[in-house]
Swiss-Prot record:
Family, as annotated: Belongs to the phytochrome family.
One GO term describing the cellular component: nucleus
Region annotation Disordered: where it falls in the sequence: 1-58
Residues annotated to bind phytochromobilin: C372
Domain GAF, first and last residues per copy: 267-449
PANTHER family on file: OS08G0260000 PROTEIN, PHYTOCHROME 1
Subunit note: Homodimer.
UniProt name for this protein: Phytochrome B
Domain Histidine kinase as annotated: residue spans: 950-1170
Biased composition range(s): Basic residues: 23-32
Organism listed in the record: Sorghum bicolor
One GO BP: detection of visible light
One Pfam family, short name: HATPase_c
Its job: Regulatory photoreceptor which exists in two forms that are reversibly interconvertible by light: the Pr form that absorbs maximally in the red region of the spectrum and the Pfr form that absorbs maximally in the far-red region. Photoconversion of Pr to Pfr induces an array of morphogenic responses, whereas reconversion of Pfr to Pr cancels the induction of those responses. Pfr controls the expression of a number of nuclear genes including those encoding the small subunit of ribulose-bisphosphate carboxylase, chlorophyll A/B binding protein, protochlorophyllide reductase, rRNA, etc.
Amino acid sequence: MASGSRATPTRSPSSARPEAPRHAHHHHHHHSQSSGGSTSRAGGGGGGGGGGGGTAATATATATESVSKAVAQYTLDARLHAVFEQSGASGRSFDYSQSLRAPPTPSSEQQIAAYLSRIQRGGHIQPFGCTLAVADDSSFRLLAFSENAADLLDLSPHHSVPSLDSAAPPPVSLGADARLLFSPSSAVLLERAFAAREISLLNPLWIHSRVSSKPFYAILHRIDVGVVIDLEPARTEDPALSIAGAVQSQKLAVRAISRLQALPGGDIKLLCDTVVEHVRELTGYDRVMVYRFHEDEHGEVVAESRRDNLEPYLGLHYPATDIPQASRFLFRQNRVRMIADCHATPVRVIQDPGMSQPLCLVGSTLRAPHGCHAQYMANMGSIASLVMAVIISSGGDDEQTGRGGISSAMKLWGLVVCHHTSPRCIPFPLRYACEFLMQAFGLQLNMELQLAHQLSEKHILRTQTLLCDMLLRDSPTGIVTQSPSIMDLVKCDGAALYYHGKYYPLGVTPTESQIKDIIEWLTVCHGDSTGLSTDSLADAGYLGAAALGDAVCGMAVAYITPSDYLFWFRSHTAKEIKWGGAKHHPEDKDDGQRMHPRSSFKAFLEVVKSRSLPWENAEMDAIHSLQLILRDSFRDAAEGTSNSKAIVNGQVQLGELELRGINELSSVAREMVRLIETATVPIFAVDTDGCINGWNAKIAELTGLSVEEAMGKSLVNDLIFKESEEIVEKLLSRALRGEEDKNVEIKLKTFGSEQSNGAIFVIVNACSSRDYTQNIVGVCFVGQDVTGQKVVMDKFINIQGDYKAIVHNPNPLIPPIFASDENTSCSEWNTAMEKLTGWSRGEVVGKFLIGEVFGSFCRLKGPDALTKFMVVIHNAIGGQDYEKFPFSFFDKNGKYVQALLTANTRSKMDGKSIGAFCFLQIASAEIQQAFEIQRQQEKKCYARMKELAYICQEIKNPLSGIRFTNSLLQMTDLNDDQRQFLETCSACEKQMSKIVKDATLQSIEDGSLVLEKSEFSFGDVMNAVVSQAMLLLRERDLQLIRDIPDEIKDASAYGDQFRIQQVLADFLLSMVRSAPSENGWVEIQVRPNVKQNSDGTDTELFIFRFACPGEGLPADIVQDMFSNSQWSTQEGVGLSTCRKILKLMGGEVQYIRESERSFFLIVLELPQPRPAADREIS
């Protein structure tokens, strides 16, 4: 979309736009209206010139929109929170419907702050575990603890009877050393965890209470004041069983992930349905749902798996405020949230009075639900819940981590929510496994969403192309009267064109008098913009909205000229919404007041009664593109200029067809700018001076250089590394001449603080950009980022034989190797691995590879990397080998290591798996091996070169003798025939001398061969060519058919005679060798022609056909002839070289196989002989 295409949203002062609702069964539920109004999205005036800042503008507008929505919702959430709190204090009940209809009152900053603090620092936990907060220093001082800590740890006075020989249990008190609460071995584990950089990757620790040795899962995370330790009682006394349980949970998750990955693409519904089935199977909850958050922040249940006797919630929509923004923020931090029993009394957290604010429980697995959430759950019959965030990437491959460790590119797409009708608590390892499953779901979903977006873009582009086509053939009314029509461009219930005072409606639309009223309102209230979109005409301030009723609620309009308009209409949302849940019964008197899914749905329908589905950004972009196309069509007509697309009775005058084509191109060009902008590959363009005039979002992201900064910079001088300068200059000069090169690698600089001095490698295709008169006006580069592949070589070292022998071999070519036992513990870590990571064998063996070795010791880039690694290890243990899996981590010193991981199953003799064996492919080891291979190749080459040098040297002497003998014969008296034979012999000798000079072939390969041109007789050339084939023809008893006109024999030409001879002789001899010996023949046909050049000179064209009957050349020789690098036959090498020489002389060759014969077709262009004065070696 062209830059500046969306105006600042306009809001009618009176319009209080209720947010479309959301219904959720977790976290803090509040209900309300959102302030806001219709969004007036105006299409901007300008087209999308080179590089178009268009998408940047769109993306920014979208981002700004979502931020403003979130901020508005924070205000509402805070106000509702206050209402709920007051209702409790005053003894009244919280009235759902009343709160929804209450007029919005602005919340003060203190109110919002208090609300956030109450949610994040509520001071209570759930009673199924206990919480400690410990100072993050050597003292391990207790800063806070939950009131149930002493009981759960068996440290209350009534748990033990003091005796003379045993010390009294340590008290759980502020300031006490937390290590004393646990067994000595557990204290050591805690100390080690506190020393780790990424403390949470070690979760869960298996620790025991000091007095009773009761086992706990300890889940640790760092906060502003220290480390929070959540202790959840473990169900078994044996740590081995606990580890087995954790590994089993991971295996189940990996199995589910593998099934997700095996699903056919292009079906998001199937993906969501599969996820709910797997989660229910893994966790055993009564109901599992996928919630999706829509663009306007309201939510919908899109998939469900439930116990048969439960009411279905599939298709339910609920208000945005059902899941407050604060909760959504928390889900990005803490992606899995369990409430074990909503009826359980929360436990208070006692904390050090010296702490400035209540303890932050954001990351705690035990944080108590807020009162209104517990009430909501109880109302809907859900006693326990498990909620998991579904996070997708909102753009960009590399996660740039922002504050709080959250990637700025991450977006909360929705939630997977589990409900149970009785208390339910699932152990931490299983929740952790579910988190992995969610990450895999997010990755898969992201791919599906991108695919869906591309398909929708393609559909829109196809429709736009067809609409353009109509505009060019007919009057503009064709876009409403024919198929496809403007209704096919975006999802709508009706559309209309108002053109030259006439109304052309389609589908569900206002009447003509109503449309005139709307146009008058647009002129008065929105006359200064170029369009408007709203999901509620009533909220937008249109007074006639009530008369339109439910049929027309939403409208998008594009102004073409001050008096011509395009409209799209949508009916109210409710008709789109289907829910299989129970309807509201009149006898449920309190149904509207209680917080319940049915009330949420009812509230949602109430809010959207006079509202349509919102217009999405992509839809507005499509409308805007069509607006620009039409504006071009109408503008000249309105001005009445001579080059207009003036429309006379629906027919366009023929003389204007060409200009119409130009206008169509400019429109399509604008649309192309939008597609280039949103492309996922780097695209950039330069003008004829080599300065940037196009720079899409992907290249901006890769280089760290924004569109604005890149524009006008010199590609060669400012943006590439010195080593690429020559390549790029050559690329540019060739493309500006119309010669387009493909697959050229260039090295671009990166910009911005973190990226300075970095480089990205891009393989580009250069395309000449032309204007409508076909003049080249610049160069466009379409690229592919290969930076990752560049770091790692392509080939793997194939390793066979005994593991131990390989692992402990000191040979530097042995790659870094590590191994896993069946429980994912590290069982091997070789010397190369120690060198690569900086961690010694003793430090890592026995530790978990997932989360501990790779995660805590060797940090990974983001949680998705850990999920992918987990899938590889578990599958390898289970018997599925992986090859060349891209794997990156930070070593002990923080250096980023990129590698390829190969993982194989380790088996006993009986085939039973005992773990996985992994090795990393690092560029340096690969390069060493490549050098070794290169050295061996060089040795071979040197031996060949010696042989070749010997032949070239020794052949010169007899050639010299032949030349001398020829010169003696020339001085004797010869008749014409004898003189002809002598000239043919001399021509063959000179051809041979040239070939000997070519021994290295380098000049032919790189195109630098110097052609020695002079005037020559074509008759001499043909005699020399035929003479070289005569012996073989006689030997094989083949008939030679010559079809050479006399004018060819007498013709003169200008070029390199002996090269032409060499090439023609080689192709002819190939035919002689391939002809069948029984009744065989070979035909030589030559035809002359003359081609006139644009500068007035003539070029002679010679067309040769060398044919023989039957199958002709063997397939491998033909393949070799057209190959540039790999040959399997000697004859093929010769033909390939001749093909290249022919190309250097401006000729070309084709090999054609017909049913009864095969032939070479050779076309050679030669200039006519120059005047004598000009002749020289060129």
